[in-house]
Amino acid sequence: MPSVSKAAAAALSGSPPQTEKPTHYRYLKEFRTEQCSLFLQHKCSQHRPFTCFHWHFLNQRRRRPLRRRDGTFNYSPDIYCSKYDEATGLCPDGDECPYLHRTTGDTERKYHLRYYKTGTCIHETDARGHCVKNGLHCAFAHGPLDLRPPVCDIRELQAQEALQNGQLSGGDGVPDLQPGVLASQAMIEKILGEDPRWQDSNFVLGSYKTEQCPKPPRLCRQGYACPHYHNSRDRRRNPRRFQYRSTPCPSVKHGDEWGEPSRCDGGDSCQYCHSRTEQQFHPEIYKSTKCNDMRQTGYCPRGPFCAFAHTEKSLAMVNEWSCRDLSSNSTSAYSSQPGSAKRKDSPSEGSQKATEDSKQNHLAVFSVAHPLAHSISSSVASSLASSTGSGSSSPTTLPTLPARALPLDPAGNTVGAVIGSALDLRLSDINIASLDKDLEEQDLGLTGPRSLAGSAPVTIPGSLPRSPSLHSSSSLSTSPLSSLSQSLSGPLVSSAMTPPQQPPPLRSEPATLGSAASSYSSLGLNGVPGSIWDFVSGSFSPSPSPILNSGPSASSSASPNSAELARVRRQLDEAKRKIRQWEESWQQVKQACDAWQREAQEAKERARVADSDRQLALQRKEEVEAKVKQLQEELEGLGLSSLPGLQSLGDISDIPLPKLHSLQSKLRLDLEAVDGVIFQLRAKQCVACQERAHGTVLRPCQHRVLCEPCAASTPECPYCKGQPLPW
């Protein structure tokens, strides 16, 4: 279980919690809690796509999360409200609803005090420092400085403290956990009630997270509580169809972080794990170690969907499966060979049984003496079990190991000795990857309880052998007997196509070598048979080949069983449903695009009309200005005075008397102004010529009334001449 954080411990002890960063506090308090004022004015530029800090519609509105004085939240961070309408954004209980509202983008949960910035984002940042997937408002931390401790509910803190102290307060040994875990437990119980097969660990190993969840994402809790996958990172490839190692894919996992499976170019045909779910539920790792929660608290909330063992019995079952399958399948393979009934009555019956016992004893010695032999023996067991089915008495033939090839040197403890012994056993083609993996773990000193070298693969019931084409592309043979196997493949295939009339002679040693080579060169990845020799081996048995059987055990019928047909029908219905959903989505998108195109055309038309109106108004303005200018020029050409005259009045006899008096007074004022101007002009001109300005002073009178030319020609002052004498 997760440990109590510092902020949570502080809240539990009664001390004030750690102060939030300004950016975190702003988002927790204000993000999508107020309506955008620019949107009401139709001016918000962040509406499409919707990246606005405030909400535009009610279904985008987020309630502000609060932690009350009693230590509880105003609404749960995990349990969704069943009354909330996602289309209208309305809840009958209003803001006082104690449950989570599934708003657009699930903002109430992502930006809750319990979850906001408490986890690291898996996506990178761009040049501006924004998340390339979620943009500016990413609810996950980008870097250690952006992380914040979660603020927990008092009930969750009490449950965590009880788990840490080993005090289980719930009934039947179940602790009083937070509401989110309780909701997951309720979902698991509902799934087990609907389909009891999930209680079987073999069914969980073969089907967990291999099919897409039929429920909509918003109506499922997802996570470990749902046995179906919801995204590519949650998906697990079906181990019955795909064969891959328990090693993480280097293209997907970097360090401790699992990336997107789409990063791998190999896709589903990749030989490595693409997710944590694929690795934990891999047949080599599943139920191979004890569950940590069961070890510490005696309770696991994941129940049957846990990838780790809950009891010592399940651990023992995992370790015994390979040996049990090896012994049972070896016996069935021997008893199902043609001519075995005849040899039972022969004198060599004891030697045959002794040979079989010696094979098993040598395998046991090999697995005990050599540190890397456990993976080899378990791979052989799993391959034999998978080829014959789990718990079925199928007469399908598998060639057995020759007795002369099995003795090993118990003192050989080096890699060279192990590989050399494997070559002597004709096992060089089986599980080379597990040898490399075990060697790496021995070099690194991984001897803990979670070491993969000590885990045995789990038999997957109903697993189908691979086709020759898949085997040739995924498993490369390095044995010196591979060329011999290939040379023998032609006649063996031809003999397999025809019913055998008598047992083939297996007396010569080359034939024995070919049989052993063909048997163990077919053991591909993780010890699962996957070559054409599985089909060839059917020629030595009166029963059909396992490659023609689709059920968990070989049968005389070549048609698939009802479960397989039901599964195919479900997949077909699911594909049809997806196609219908895609068609509906495409129709909606097409209608939206058509509406946007119509709006764009209308906007362009309105802009064109407005531009033409503007051009017309400018043209009219220029015409009016030109007409005014022309009238002014005509008035100047007529030479009319600015003073009002009688010519503009027309017949003055028709003018009323008051207006005539007003006109008279105005004309008098104008006349006086004209007289004043005339007097001033005359006072400046010469009295004699009245053309030039006066400038000469006459003597002795000192009058300045004549210009210089007139003063020279006139001896007397004209001003004094016109004046009477003073006496």
Curated annotation (Swiss-Prot):
Zn finger (RING-type) ranges are 686-721
Q: Which UniProt keywords apply?
A: Cytoplasm, Metal-binding, Nucleus, Repeat, Transferase, Ubl conjugation, Ubl conjugation pathway, Zinc, Zinc-finger
Any GO MF annotation of the entry: transferase activity
**Annotated zinc fingers (C3H1-type), start-end:** 75-104, 115-145, 243-277, 285-313
GO CC entries: cytosol; nucleus
Q: From its record, what is one biological process in GO terms? A: protein ubiquitination
Q: Which residues form the signal peptide?
A: none
Keyword Metal-binding carried by entry: yes
Expressed in which tissues: Ubiquitous.
Pathway note: Protein modification; protein ubiquitination
EC number from the UniProt entry: 2.3.2.-
Domain comment (free text) = Although this protein contains a RING domain, intrinsic E3 ligase activity has not been proven.
Q: What is this protein called?
A: Putative E3 ubiquitin-protein ligase UNKL
Q: Which organism is it from?
A: Mus musculus (Mouse)
Its encoding gene is what? Unkl
